[in-house]
């Protein structure tokens, strides 16, 4: 297994920006996964996240093994529930939904996951997950039955992120949601980045190289691209190479 967290810390210390591609298992075609992974390997991606809000875990082992046969990038689980855990991945973002007050996503699912995790060698990276209002209801809202935080209340979001860090989370993830109409505000990214000392991940609603660069410049250490790549696997072509990931 490859440990990602030390690499993420090293990248943050060296101001090296990271890009993760989020793959929804419900939408993956195993027959065409080779072509998809080839696109990822040619992109600026440094990590692959696998998971979705409603996926029930069927064939997840097969999906991860197929990915690992075709890429050397670290593969981290991004689980919506404990059924989305497999020992075949390299690690897991062990999520705590800090923006909501549904006990299932604050602690219950984490407790349920313990017997499964104890049987694996997964690198477990505790992650404070904060859903931000994005202009429309997202799958995360529907599944978790929680409301996102106000996209204009930068100080409260920054306080929430800091609380997540003080609780012990190793990463903070600001999420606008899959297919979000609006990305996380740049001023909010800046406010959170200035308040916390752990690495900051930002995802949802980012649809262009400009959007990625703006998030980096605002303080994101890792940007997650999901729907944009899902809708267009040529998203990065003729646009970026791995050597062009910015160092603001």
Regions found by a protein language model. Give the residues of each.
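Conserved anion-binding
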Residues: 84-165
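Active-site mouth loops of central-metabolism enzymes
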Residues: 17-33, 79-81, 131-157, 202, ...
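Alpha-helix-loop-beta-strand connector modules within alpha/beta enzyme cores
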Residues: 60-83, 113-120, 125, 182-208, ...
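N-terminal amphipathic alpha-helix/helix-capping segment at the start of soluble metabolic enzymes
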Residues: 1-23, 113-127, 133
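Glycine/Thr-rich beta-alpha phosphate-binding loop at enzyme active sites
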Residues: 142-188, 230-237
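Active-site beta->alpha loop and helix N-cap motifs at the rims of alpha/beta catalytic domains
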Residues: 23, 27-37, 47-52, 70, ...
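Glycine-rich phosphate-binding active-site loops on the catalytic face of alpha/beta enzymes
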Residues: 49-55, 91, 95-106, 174-179, ...
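Hydrophobic faces of well-ordered beta-strands that scaffold small-molecule active sites
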Residues: 19-23, 48-50, 75-77, 92-94, ...
């Amino acid at each position: 297994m490859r440990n990602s967290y030390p690499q993420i810390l090293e990248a943050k210390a060296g101001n090296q920006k990271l890009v993760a591609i989020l793959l929804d298992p419900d939408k993956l075609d195993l027959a065409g996964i080779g072509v998809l992974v080839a696109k990822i390997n040619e992109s600026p991606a440094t990590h692959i996240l696998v998971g979705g809000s409603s996926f029930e875990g069927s064939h997840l082992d097969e999906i991860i093994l197929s990915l690992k046969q075709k890429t050397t990038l670290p593969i981290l689980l991004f689980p919506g529930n404990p059924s989305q855990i497999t020992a075949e991945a390299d690690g897991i973002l062990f999520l705590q939904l800090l923006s909501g007050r549904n006990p299932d996503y604050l602690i219950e699912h984490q407790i349920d996951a313990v017997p499964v995790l104890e049987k694996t060698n997964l690198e477990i990276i505790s992650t404070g997950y904060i859903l931000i209002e994005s202009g429309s209801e997202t799958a995360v809202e529907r599944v978790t039955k929680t409301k996102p935080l106000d996209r204009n209340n930068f100080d409260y979001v920054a306080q929430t992120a800091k609380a997540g860090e003080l609780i012990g989370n190793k990463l903070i993830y600001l999420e606008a949601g899959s297919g979000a109409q609006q990305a996380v505000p740049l001023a909010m990214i800046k406010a959170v980045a200035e308040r916390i000392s752990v690495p900051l991940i930002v995802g949802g609603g980012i649809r262009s190289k400009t959007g990625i660069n703006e998030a980096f410049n605002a303080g994101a250490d890792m940007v997650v691209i999901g729907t944009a790549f899902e809708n267009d696997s040529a998203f990065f072509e003729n646009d970026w190479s791995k050597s062009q990931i910015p160092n603001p």
